[in-house]
Amino acid sequence: ELAALVTPRTKLICLNNPNNPTGALMERPLLERIVRIARDAGSWILCDGVYRFLVHDPKVRVPSVADLYERGVVTGSLSKCFSLAGLRIGWAVGPEAFIGDLFSHRDYTTISCGRLDDRLGCLALEHRETILGRNLALLRRCASVLERWVDSEPRVSMVKPRAGTTAFLHYDHHLDSQTFCRRLYDRDRTLLVPGTCFDRDRWLRVGYAFAPDDLETGLGRVSGFLRQL
C-alpha cells in the first residue's frame, strides 16, 4: 500500500515506531522495505522514536532508521521512556549536514534549555539502565493487567501492544468514541482518548504506564460503564 502511494514527488515519509496508540512495532524487515521504497523515490524518512527504549520483549532489537538509510532522521526525547516530560529535552539523529541545518533553525525557537533541566537530563542518561529497567518492569506488569481485563470483557478487543505505554481498544457498541469518553469521564472520572482522534471511531486509547492497582481500578470503572450501556 505504501509503495502505491509514494511517487517521485513524495518528499517525506513519516513513521511512528513504536506506534502510538497501538503499541505496534516495525522490525528490521519491514523497515528495510520502507527504506527501499523511500530510496527509489528519493524521499526522506522521519521516524518518531520516543518509545524506542520501551520494547517489552528484551530479545527484540529494533534498528534506527538513521542507521538504515542515508536520508533517515529519528527523533527521541526524555519525556516518554524516562518519564521526564517536564524537562522538555529531546534529540534528533540523522545525516551530518541535515543536523547542521537543524541546529541553525533551532536557534530561532529554543536558544538553550534551563541549566537544571540540562543537569537532570544528563543524570537520567547516565543512569539510563536503572531507569529504563524500572519502567520496563512496570510496563510488563501493567500490560498483563490490561491483557487479562480485555480477555474478561466480551465487548472489548485489542492487538496486544509490543512496546510503548498505550494500547488501542475496540469496543462493540454503536456509541461513538467521543461520546463514550465524555460519558465515562462524567460518570466515573476516568479518562480514555477517543479513537476519532486517530481517525478510528469505536476505538479507545488507554495509557497503562502507572501503578497496577490504579490501572485495575480504572479498568473496573470502564467495565461498569460498559455494563450500563
Question: Which role does the model predict for each range below?
Answer:
Residues 93, 168-170, 207-209:
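Short hydrophobic/aromatic beta-strand micro-patches
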Residues 14-15, 45-47, 76, 192-194:
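Hydrophobic residues in well-ordered beta-strands that form the structural core
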Residues 40-41, 153, 188, 229:
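Helix C-cap/helix->beta junction micro-motif
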Residues 1-9, 21-44, 49-84, 97:
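Active-site pre-lysine segment of PLP-dependent enzymes
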Residues 68-140, 147-149, 220:
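Conserved core segment of the aminotransferase class I/II
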Residues 122, 138-147, 158-171:
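Conserved glycine-rich beta-strand-loop-beta hairpin in the small C-terminal domain of fold type I
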Residues 3, 174-175, 182-192, 198-229:
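PLP-dependent enzyme catalytic core of the Aspartate aminotransferase-like
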Residues 74, 154-158, 190-195:
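A short linear hydrophobic-aromatic micro-motif
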